[in-house]
Amino acid sequence: MSNKKLHFETLQLHVGQEQADPATDSRAVPIYQTTSYVFRNSQHAADRFGLRDAGNIYGRLTNSTQGVFEDRVAALEGGVAGLAVASGAAAITYALQNVARNGDHIIAADNLYGGTYNLVEHTLSTQGVETTIVNPSDFDAVDKAFKPNTKAIIIETFGNPNASVTDVDRISEIAHKHNTIVIVDNTFGTPFLFRPIEHGADVVVHSATKFIGGHGSSLGGVIVDAGKFDWKANADKYPSIAKPDPSYHGAVFAEVAGPAAFVTRIRAVILRDTGAAISPFNAWILLQGLETLSLRVERHAFNTKKVVEFLANHPKVAKVNHPSLPDHPDHALYEKLFPNGGGSIFTFEVKGGEKEAWAFIDSLKIFSLLANVADVKSLVIHPATTTHSQLSPEELEQQHIYPSTIRLSIGTEHYEDIIDDLANALENI
């Protein structure tokens, strides 16, 4: 390939395998279904384990199929390196555990996915990590939430489930004033529509199960390192990355791995010790999805626009929570950050309550009632009694989830068929 900067649609097909597979001459990325790798000699083995020679060591840490997937997602996000793990939840957990330990503090947006909210509010607290929950649109509150021991702020490009939009530029500006990293979950944004690193993010995480895979078939997560944070200048704040690691013979990851220090430390230490490794087969399946990401996301966005317009004008719909609507509080920010649309996972409220919401859901024919999102098939769920059922009534209200709230994930079927299904179900309430 030439040195000319390639377009997204080309990168999603070629990065990581610019030439045919060196072992087999295969054009498609092979599935390297192995646990282990043969070293040429003892010195070669020692160099691999000592991080002096990059390459495969053991299947829990690296795999050649996985490596192509990691390189491709990192390139699409504009990062320097990526790490694929077993799920999106593992990616988020590892990103936070990489910098926050017992006695530390993190900040989390109040519009995070319910599973992430439980992680930061409950699970990490048992590990001695304190979390402050903030409204990411209240910049004064965000600024005041920082403490000397704050190690990260985690936000989402689109909130789950209400598709609220986060001003990544402003949050990054505030966090960097406090010499703190910004972790952005870009699962719903996708790198095709929005690249958080270009807006100040230091780390990007994905549930690759969603848009990247796109077909609801395989679990996976990805962590992308922007490679821009100065770890050595903040060594006292981030000793796990910028000071000697006693579990790795005193290696300083900021020196050994340079710009890729963040993900290298996760791979070499946290993944090594806790083992949420992605399987080669899942990495391969997710690669198949990644190759058509732009095509699918364009259709998702187009269909979503049509569906939102339909619901916003239906007499049995009380409210549609989508930033494309002029009366949405994030509308101006949405127009600025997402000129090509997006937000195909969103909520709306039927007139009535849980009874009416359930009646609507149970009357749908094309939509599938399940917990996943961002599938090519249209999906539906009742958040208050399923995905967010662990939250207290006060927490549900804080996230604007009510008995009448329904979450939709708009697929790539023909938009008229999607709308007909919604219209018929609304007639049954």
Report the location of each language-model feature:
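Short hydrophobic/aromatic beta-strand micro-patches
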Residues: V224, T347-E349, S409-G411
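Conserved small-domain helix->loop->beta segment predominantly found in fold-type I
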Residues: T274-A283, Q288, T292, V297-R299, ...
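Conserved N-terminal alpha-helix of the aminotransferase class I/II PLP-enzyme fold
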Residues: N41-T93, G115-H122
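N-terminal "arm"/small-domain region of PLP-dependent enzymes with the aminotransferase-like
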Residues: S2-N63, D71-R72
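Active-site beta-loop-alpha junctions enriched in small/polar residues
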Residues: F158, T187-G189, L325, K351, ...
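PLP-dependent enzyme catalytic core of the Aspartate aminotransferase-like
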Residues: E9, V80, E121, P148, ...
